[in-house]
């Protein structure tokens, strides 16, 4: 028995791994940007920070996955957008600190290496990188028979960005009276899916629920997470934003306080929040308490900005999209987030 045959008999297909690398090269090439050094396949991805032109550079990093949304991608055999979700979860976190994404690395583990499927996943990662302006400079695809079922895989990513030291957003600039501006989400994004899957467990993916405005359930559930980098970065560059909250796991209640100091609180005006149909459906079909919805989901606002009142007009001008004035920063008396 040759070593190659022995490895194949253990469930690892080396040739399929080589095929994946060849398939993804064209997708990786789409993401190239100034600063990238070396070619795909090296032991480490390289990036030349001097190409960024940042005078006092601070590197800001983030890592994340897509949770059990991945189980729906597998269930519905739709793998071309889940990679964008992974990128979004990472780069939206670092833009909240004022960072411009520079590069991204992905990690895929699977029970059986299926090149066509994994190409779709990486194509989605590349699309997310293009939207974020980040280079896909490396990654790992691990075939792990026995650890995962043949049809299963897991996906995680790691993003690194850069900011001028003077433009870091860390909550210290937010003050009483700042206006809270909300940017629309594209849907559920990539958190809360253990609950989402339970609520819709008895519905087919093709189901058309009246609340979802004619869209198939699986289309709504797998809607890619919006990437906010290109919308928000110009605001950071002009020093127009005091605080940013990426509304992910924990909803408004957990994430909004992360952008200001402990003596402050956020007053949210619920009637100003553009609640998406999917959240109304989740609340109804899942019999979820209304208040709890704001503790789990983004409710239609995927990113929140704290902005001085005199800067609101300029922020709206630069964003060139619907911007929702959904609250203000107040002195904290009890709770960190008050939804009125």
Curated annotation (Swiss-Prot):
Catalytic class of the enzyme: ligase
Gene Ontology biological process terms, A to Z: 'de novo' IMP biosynthetic process; adenine biosynthetic process
Annotated localization = Cytoplasm
Q: Name one Pfam family in it.
A: AIRS_C
Identify the keywords attached in UniProt to this record, alphabetized: ATP-binding, Cytoplasm, Ligase, Nucleotide-binding, Purine biosynthesis
Which GO CC annotations does the UniProt entry carry?
cytosol
The record, for InterPro entries, names:
PurM-like_C_dom, PurM-like_C_sf, PurM-like_N, PurM-like_N_sf, PurM_cligase
What reaction does this catalyse? 2-formamido-N(1)-(5-O-phospho-beta-D-ribosyl)acetamidine + ATP = 5-amino-1-(5-phospho-beta-D-ribosyl)imidazole + ADP + phosphate + H(+)
Q: Which superkingdom, per the lineage?
A: Bacteria
Might you give the EC number(s) for this enzyme? 6.3.3.1
Membership in a protein family: Belongs to the AIR synthase family.
Q: What is the protein name given in its UniProt record?
A: Phosphoribosylformylglycinamidine cyclo-ligase
Instruction: Give the species.
Output: Streptococcus uberis (strain ATCC BAA-854 / 0140J)
Q: What is the lineage of its organism?
A: Bacteria, Bacillati, Bacillota, Bacilli, Lactobacillales
């Amino acid at each position: 028995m040759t070593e190659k045959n022995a490895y194949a008999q253990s469930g690892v297909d080396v040739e399929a791994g080589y095929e994946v690398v060849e398939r993804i090269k064209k997708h990786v090439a789409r993401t190239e940007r100034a600063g990238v050094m070396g070619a795909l396949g090296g032991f480490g991805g390289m990036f030349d920070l001097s190409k960024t032109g940042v005078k006092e550079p601070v590197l800001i990093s983030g890592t994340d996955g897509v949770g059990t949304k991945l189980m729906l991608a597998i269930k519905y055999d739709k793998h071309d957008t889940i990679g964008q979700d992974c990128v979004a979860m990472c780069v939206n976190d670092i833009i909240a600190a004022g960072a411009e994404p520079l590069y991204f690395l992905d990690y895929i583990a699977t029970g059986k290496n299926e090149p066509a499927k994994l190409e779709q996943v990486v194509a989605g990662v590349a699309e997310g990188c293009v939207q974020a302006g980040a280079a896909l400079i490396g990654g790992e695809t691990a075939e792990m028979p026995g650890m995962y079922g043949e049809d299963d895989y897991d996906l995680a990513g790691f993003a690194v960005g850069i900011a001028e030291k003077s433009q870091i957003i860390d909550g210290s600039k937010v003050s009483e009276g700042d206006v809270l501006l909300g940017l629309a989400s594209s849907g559920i994004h990539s958190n809360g899916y253990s609950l989402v899957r339970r609520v819709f467990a008895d519905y087919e993916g093709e189901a058309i629920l009246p609340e979802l405005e004619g869209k198939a359930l699986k289309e709504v559930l797998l809607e890619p997470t919006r990437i906010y980098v290109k919308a928000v970065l110009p605001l950071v560059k002009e020093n127009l934003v005091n605080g940013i909250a990426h509304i992910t796991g924990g909803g408004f209640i957990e994430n909004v306080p992360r952008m200001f100091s402990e003596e402050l609180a956020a007053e949210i005006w619920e009637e100003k929040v553009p609640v998406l149909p999917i959240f109304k459906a989740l609340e109804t079909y899942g019999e979820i308490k209304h208040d709890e919805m704001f503790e789990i989901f983004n409710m239609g606002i995927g990113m929140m900005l704290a902005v001085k009142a005199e800067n609101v007009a300029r922020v709206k001008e630069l964003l060139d999209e619907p911007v929702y004035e959904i609250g203000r920063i107040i002195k904290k008396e009890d709770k960190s987030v008050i939804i009125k």
